[in-house]
Amino acid sequence: MTFRLMQAALLLSLAGCSASPSQSADAPSIGRPFAVSEVAIFNSPWAMAFLPGSSAALVTEKPGRIWLVDIGSGSKQPVGGVPRVVVSSQGGLLDVKAAPDFTASRLVYLTYSEPSPNRGSGLALARAQLVRDGGGAKLSNVQVLWRDPAGGEGGQFGAIIAFAADNKSLFLSSGERQRFTPAQDPSQPLGKILHLTLDGKPAPGNPMAGRMGAPVVTITDPPRDTEAAKSAEGRQFRWPGPNLTPAETWSSGHRNPYGLAFDAEGRLWETEMGPRGGDELNLILPGKNYGWPLVSEGRNYDGVPIPPGSSRPDFVPPKLFWAPSISPSSLLIYDGKLFPQWKGSGFIGALSGEALVRVTFSGDSAQKADRWDMGSRIRWVGEGPDGGIYLLEDGTRARLLRLTPAKPSG
């Protein structure tokens, strides 16, 4: 861990972790201060990565496809060499990011649900080289850097990649796969934010650096996405080698973390889907526990209440929460020039909310600012090299949209 990251982590750890979460009014904003244009159409897209030094981007589709798209013309071509994925309601080909040194290395990072030798599928983090020759493109030398060896059934993979501010390590969100209890088990990678080297090893300076997990863990499979998961019978899984989960873990107690982004000061923010209500915006601190499934600002899908965060001051509460749910899908912290008034704002894609949500930050606090109705489920939000804000809709005929400043009326 670099001095800058260690310094930021120390300051954040000392900053009021026990503050109450904010749940202010969340009414839709009137009018849109941006124009919306369509760039291209995709089938079940999940994520997008702009490629430095070009007008090209990679778009993943959950069924196992990657497209190379020109964001200027909207033209696209398939990318070959994609690893095999297991497609389910929330599983398949998921996140994609260009490596920090992409211009020189041509490396990209992927997350996906891979076939498990035990049962179902497990989350995998892979790295590959993007090769372009003539009119084609393919992934070469695909290498799995990290995986959940236990596998199993269930959705909620998380699977979001964020490179550290110094570009020497990465953070990976790992959902709890609808099993509840692993989020509080230090020997299971589910329900965690992991901090890894660029080669997928435990990053130096992690809160539990050097610690090993239990060689045998209990897997709730099939999962129970209700309170019943806490008492469900499970199968025993023996780790195929040293269990490095504690050494990999940055934070714990997460449900389905779908957004990870650093602000300009090096703070790591996360958006997380709650159960029925209780979607969260969290400031991620090293070694902290965010409480799931023991506390939440929402309720279980079967209506069984969950104790609120205020009942457990030993857990870190969210900075913001949404009840009813908006189903946050992704997080962008804007740093472009096209919308100077929004520099430093957070933008959250909302699935069930069918909206683009804006939040503002002040140090380690956050405030709800705007919520624009988009009329469709927003799967992903990001910033383009032109400073435009780009959105991917969810679904089998989903548009890639570009947001630019609205022209003054009259």
Predicted ranges, named:
Residues 25-29, 91-93, 101-103, 124, ...:
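Beta-propeller domain segments
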Residues 6-16:
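Bacterial N-terminal signal peptides
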Residues 41, 154, 253-254, 374:
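Amphipathic coiled-coil/heptad-repeat helices and related helical stalk/stem segments
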Residues 17-181, 259-261, 267-274, 324-364, ...:
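Acidic, Gly/Ser/Thr-rich repeat motifs that build Ca2+-stabilized beta-propeller blades
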Residues 1-4:
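Positively charged n-region of N-terminal signal peptides that target proteins for export
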Residues 114, 144-150, 209-216, 298, ...:
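Short, solvent-exposed aromatic-acidic interface loops
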